[in-house]
Curated annotation (Swiss-Prot):
The keyword rRNA-binding does not apply. Residues 15-30, 63-74, 86-101 have a biased composition (Polar residues). It comes from the Eukaryota. A motif (VHIID) lies at residues 282-286. The lineage of its organism: Eukaryota, Viridiplantae, Streptophyta, Embryophyta, Tracheophyta. This is Chitin-inducible gibberellin-responsive protein 2.
Length: 544
């Protein structure tokens, strides 16, 4: 079985499985940050699955199940995934109406006759006197007050579906309803939220059409955002983690279903092979080595080089949280790659560096003069905090540091999306558009009611979606940027583009022949884009 990659945060192209949709349990373990696969230190933290629980002091959402679909549950007392009652669900508010009129109390304490008469007079007479008093105090505005009160009462009596239609959203238009709900969350419009969440719950389903499946996780992200902010969000989203062997199985499941990882690996390896052609000593620095899968094909290619293979040294960087998916530390990666190199008769050395990418300094890398240096960032640099998160701006610092090492090539593979600094409504809409394409591409390959597919989407894609929607500041680990922004950063760091060769382009086109015709390959601005239909999803580029 082919080796497969892992992911820190679980970007769209990796997976975290689950054996049982009922296994969600809540935890307030303070060791887990908002980013579920990143620890604040290098201490090993076993990652957890995430379900949802509302911590809102104003209204806790209860889940109500109806038949025939897998659904998500955000109740406080139940697990967030319900399989025993497969269906769409709706929310009700335990606190009742989101709007309530304040009671006004007027106490008379001065012993006046009015105060005495309040006790002794006929109740009907008392009511009339109070109305007369109200008329004097409110004057002509009393009719306005009554009108407003009646309007609120009428609104509250509306069923959510009717209220949504009054907003001009066509019945069943999930995309528009999701965007409207996100806008209501941004505006803190609790009444609109309480109307739209139940209606959304009737439409979304983790076993439905692509947009319905995605919508289930988008709603969970909105609920998590409402529940709290920052690190406490993911305290409400923790669930048990499967054993590492199951984890790897699900990673392989998605790796084979979609070509995104293979595209990234093949394009980066092709650029590296071109850049180090004729070199006798090669040093590759991989800022997210994961399982080391990317380098197997490159070692095989270097072994076939005319005149014999070069000496290869790989520095593998990965923080300790990835050890769970591997079932051990970086030494497992080193042993595996050493075995492959031995079979290929390639002189090989592995240098493990168990540290967060944002903490890497030049002194950690052991660069030796005379080596041809290649630096690889595959679906990793968007995890590195930039200037919008911290004045340290490790994203640009790393690029400047790498440039100071004079590499032959830097390879960058990233998601083509703009969610880093966009305001929340735009970020939500971009996330919806991007992941719609991802879920559609999966839908063409795997049955909708396939349990492995449901688990894969739930425990991989869902946690990234929730992070994008629910978290802010340092807790929002998923910070994608479009290629234009990466190009500007690399240029400012002193890099120049190295267009990918026609051979790389042709090799990837051959790969895509095994997949749907809806996958599109395009080359522009010196970069190679892989997309679904008209939506670019992943972009690969090389720099020197």
């Amino acid at each position: 079985m082919a080796d497969t990659p892992t992911s820190r945060m679980i970007h769209p192209f990796s997976n975290i499985p689950s054996q049982n949709l009922k296994q969600f349990q809540y935890s307030d373990n303070p060791q887990h940050p908002c980013h579920p696969y990143r620890a604040p230190s290098d201490t090993h933290v076993v990652p957890h699955h995430y379900g949802l629980k509302s911590h809102s002091p104003d209204a806790g959402y209860e889940s109500q199940a109806t038949p025939n679909k897998y659904t998500l549950d955000s109740s406080e007392g139940a697990g967030c995934m319900r399989h025993d009652s497969p269906s769409s669900q709706s929310f009700t508010t335990r606190s009742g109406s989101p709007l309530s009129q304040e009671d006004s109390h007027s106490d008379s304490t001065d012993g006046s006759p009015v105060g005495a008469s309040c006790v002794t007079e006929d109740p009907n007479d008392l009511k009339q006197k109070l109305k007369d008093l109200e008329a004097v105090m409110l004057g002509p505005d009393s009719e306005i007050v009554n009108s407003l009160e009646n309007s609120v009462a009428n609104q509250l009596s509306l069923e959510p579906e009717k209220w949504v239609r009054m907003m001009g959203i066509p019945r069943g238009n999930l995309k528009e309803l999701l965007i409207a709900c996100a806008r209501a969350v941004e505006e803190k419009n609790s009444f609109a939220i309480d109307m739209m969440i139940p209606e959304l719950r009737k439409i979304v389903s983790v076993s439905g059409e692509p947009l319905e499946r995605l919508g289930a996780y988008m709603v969970e992200g909105l609920v998590a955002r409402l529940a709290s902010s920052g690190i406490s969000i993911y305290k409400a989203l923790k669930c048990k983690e499967p054993k590492s062997s199951d984890l790897l199985s699900y990673m392989h499941f998605l790796y084979e279903a979609c070509p995104y990882f293979k595209f990234g690996y093949m394009s980066a390896n092709g650029a590296i092979a071109e850049a180090v052609k004729g070199e006798d000593r090669i040093h590759i620095i991989d800022f997210h080595i994961s399982q080391g899968a990317q380098w197997i094909s490159l070692l095989q290619a270097l072994a076939a080089r005319p005149g014999g293979p070069p000496t290869v040294r790989i520095t593998g960087i990965d923080d300790s949280v990835s050890a769970y998916a591997r079932g051990g530390g970086l030494e497992l990666v080193g042993r595996r790659l050493s075995h492959i190199a031995s079979l290929c008769k390639v002189p090989f050395e592995f240098h493990p560096l168990a540290i967060s990418g944002s903490k890497v300094e030049a002194a950690h890398l052991g660069v030796i003069p005379g080596e041809a240096l290649a630096v690889n960032f595959t679906l990793e640099l968007h995890h590195i905090p930039d200037e919008s998160v911290s004045t340290a701006n490790h994203r640009d610092r790393l690029l400047r540091m790498v440039k100071s090492l004079s590499p032959k090539v830097l390879t960058l593979v990233e998601m083509e999306s703009n969610t880093n600094t966009a305001p929340f409504p735009q970020r939500f809409a971009e996330t919806l558009d991007y992941y719609t394409a991802i879920f559609e591409s999966i839908d063409l390959t795997l049955p909708r009611d396939d349990r492995e597919r449901i688990n894969m989407e739930q425990h991989c894609l869902a946690r990234e979606i929730v992070n994008l929607i629910a978290c802010e500041g340092e807790e929002r680990a998923e910070r994608y940027e479009p290629f234009g922004k990466w190009k500007a950063r690399l240029t400012m760091a002193g890099f120049r583009p190295s267009p990918l060769s026609s051979l790389v382009n042709a090799t990837i086109r051959t790969l895509l022949q095994s997949y749907s015709d809806n996958y599109k390959l395009a080359e522009r601005d010196g970069a190679l884009y892989l997309g679904w239909k008209s939506r670019p999803l992943v972009v690969s580029s090389a720099w020197h």
